[in-house]
C-alpha cells in the first residue's frame, strides 16, 4: 500500500467536490497511485470547445505541495498536444504557470483547484503559446469537440474511474452542463448565536477579573491589618522596654544616694583614724581592708551583670505583650545587685580621696608637732642660757 501525504488526500477530496459544482469538472485519482489524478473537462460555453469532453491527468510530485506538478492531455482538443496513456514518466506535459515549467511561481498554497482553473482559462486563449500548445482553426476545434465524445466512450481509464459518465456517453444520455446552471459554492457567514457566545465569554471573563480584583482587595486589607497588629505589638514592646529603663534609672539614683552617704561616713571614719598617732599603720591596714572589700564586692557585681544581660535577651526575644510584662517582674528583682555595681565605682573615687587628703593632713599635723616640739626645746634652751 502506497504512503500518501495527508495534503494530497485533502486536495483530492476538496477538488472532487468544489470543481464539479463550480465548473462541471470531474476529478478522481488512480486506485494504485494517488499521485496520478485524472480529470475530465467540459468545453466552456461560447467557445469552439463547447459540447466537448476532454480527458487529462495531473501527476503530482512525491513532495507535494512543495513542488509543482505536471499536467498532461489525453483527449485531442486542437489546443494542446495529446499523449497516449500510460504517459511516459519523462514527459513534462504542458507549460503553464502552475506546472513544473515555472517552479518560481509555485507556492505550497496552490492545489488541484488552482491548477485546473488556470488551465481552463489558458485553454480559451488561442494566442497564448508555449510548450505543448497547438494552433488550430475554430472549425477544427469544433470538429474535435464532437469527436471527443466517441474518444471518451472508448477510454478504459474513464470507464474505470468515471463509470457513470462513461455509461451516459455510450448510451447517448449525456447532456453538457452549462456553467450558469451550476450551483455556486455557498460560504457560510457567522450567525448571531456565535456573537452571543462571544459576548457570554467576555462577560464570564469580566466576572472572573472582578472576582480576582475582589480577592486582591481582600488580601491587601488583610496585609494592612497584619501590619497594624505588628506595629501595635512593636509599640507595646517599646513601651515595656521604656518602663524597664525607668526602673533601672530609679535604682541607679537610689544607689547614687547610698554611695554618697557611704562616702561621707567613710570620710568621717577616715578623719578620726588620721588623728591617731599610729596613722601610717592604720592607713596601710585600711587600704588592705578596702582592697579586700572591693575584691569581694566586685565578684557579686559580675554575677549580677550577667543575670541582667540574660533577662534583657529574654525580654527582647519575646514578642507577646504578656511575656514582656512577666519579664518586668523578673528584672526588678536583680536590679538590687546593681546598687553594688555603682557603689563600687563610688568607692574607687572615695579611695583616691582617702589616700590623698588624710596623708596631707597627717603630714601637716606631724610637721606641726615637730615644729612645736622644736620650738619648745629652743625656748627651754634660751631660758637656760638666760639663767646662766
UniProtKB/Swiss-Prot annotation:
* Segments of skewed composition (Acidic residues): 221-238, 246-297
Ranges where the UBC core domain occurs: 3-162
Q: Where is the active site?
A: 95 (glycyl thioester intermediate)
Name a Pfam family for this protein: UQ_con
Q: Where is this region: Disordered?
A: 195-388
Keywords annotated in UniProt: ATP-binding, Nucleotide-binding, Transferase, Ubl conjugation pathway
Molecular function terms, GO-annotated: ATP binding; ubiquitin conjugating enzyme activity
Q: What is its EC number?
A: 2.3.2.23
- What's a BP term from Gene Ontology annotated to this protein? protein ubiquitination
- Pathway(s) this gene product operates in, as recorded in its UniProt entry: Protein modification; protein ubiquitination
Q: What does the protein in this record do?
A: Catalyzes the covalent attachment of ubiquitin to other proteins.
Instruction: Spell out the family assignment given in the record's similarity comment.
Output: Belongs to the ubiquitin-conjugating enzyme family.
Its recorded name reads Probable ubiquitin-conjugating enzyme E2 L709
Amino acid at each position: 500500500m502506497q504512503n500518501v501525504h495527508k495534503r494530497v488526500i485533502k486536495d483530492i477530496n476538496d477538488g472532487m467536490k468544489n470543481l464539479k459544482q463550480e465548473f462541471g469538472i470531474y476529478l478522481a485519482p488512480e486506485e494504485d497511485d494517488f499521485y496520478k489524478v485524472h480529470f475530465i473537462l467540459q468545453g466552456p460555453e461560447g467557445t469552439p470547445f463547447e459540447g466537448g469532453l476532454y480527458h487529462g491527468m495531473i501527476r503530482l510530485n512525491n513532495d507535494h505541495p512543495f513542488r509543482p506538478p505536471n499536467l498532461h492531455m489525453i483527449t485531442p482538443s486542437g489546443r494542446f498536444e495529446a499523449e497516449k496513456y500510460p504517459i511516459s514518466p519523462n514527459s513534462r506535459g504542458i507549460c503553464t504557470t502552475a506546472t513544473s515549467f515555472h517552479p518560481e511561481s509555485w507556492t505550497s498554497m496552490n492545489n488541484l483547484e488552482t491548477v485546473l482553473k488556470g488551465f481552463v482559462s489558458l485553454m480559451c486563449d488561442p494566442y497564448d503559446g508555449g510548450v505543448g500548445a497547438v494552433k488550430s482553426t475554430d472549425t477544427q476545434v469544433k470538429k474535435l469537440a464532437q469527436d471527443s465524445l466517441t474518444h471518451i466512450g472508448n477510454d478504459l481509464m474513464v470507464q474505470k474511474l468515471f463509470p457513470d459518465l462513461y455509461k451516459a456517453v455510450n448510451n447517448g444520455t449525456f447532456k453538457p452542463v452549462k456553467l450558469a446552471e451550476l450551483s455556486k459554492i455557498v460560504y457560510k457567514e457567522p450567525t448571531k448565536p456565535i456573537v452571543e457566545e462571544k459576548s457570554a465569554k467576555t462577560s464570564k471573563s469580566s466576572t472572573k477579573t472582578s472576582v480576582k480584583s475582589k480577592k486582591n482587595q481582600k488580601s491587601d486589607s488583610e496585609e494592612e491589618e497584619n501590619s497594624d497588629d505588628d506595629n501595635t505589638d512593636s509599640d507595646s514592646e517599646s513601651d515595656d522596654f521604656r518602663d524597664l529603663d525607668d526602673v533601672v534609672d530609679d535604682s541607679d539614683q537610689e544607689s547614687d544616694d547610698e554611695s554618697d552617704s557611704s562616702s561621707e561616713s567613710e570620710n568621717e571614719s577616715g578623719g578620726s583614724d588620721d588623728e591617731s598617732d599610729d596613722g601610717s599603720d592604720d592607713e596601710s591596714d585600711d587600704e588592705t581592708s578596702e582592697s579586700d572589700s572591693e575584691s569581694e564586692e566586685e565578684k557579686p557585681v559580675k554575677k549580677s551583670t550577667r543575670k541582667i544581660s540574660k533577662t534583657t535577651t529574654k525580654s527582647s526575644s519575646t514578642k507577646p505583650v504578656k511575656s514582656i510584662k512577666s519579664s518586668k517582674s523578673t528584672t526588678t528583682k536583680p536590679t538590687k545587685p546593681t546598687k553594688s555595681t555603682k557603689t563600687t565605682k563610688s568607692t574607687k573615687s572615695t579611695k583616691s580621696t582617702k589616700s590623698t587628703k588624710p596623708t596631707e593632713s597627717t603630714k601637716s599635723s606631724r610637721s606641726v608637732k615637730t615644729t612645736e616640739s622644736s620650738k619648745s626645746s629652743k625656748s627651754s634652751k634660751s631660758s637656760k642660757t638666760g639663767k646662766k
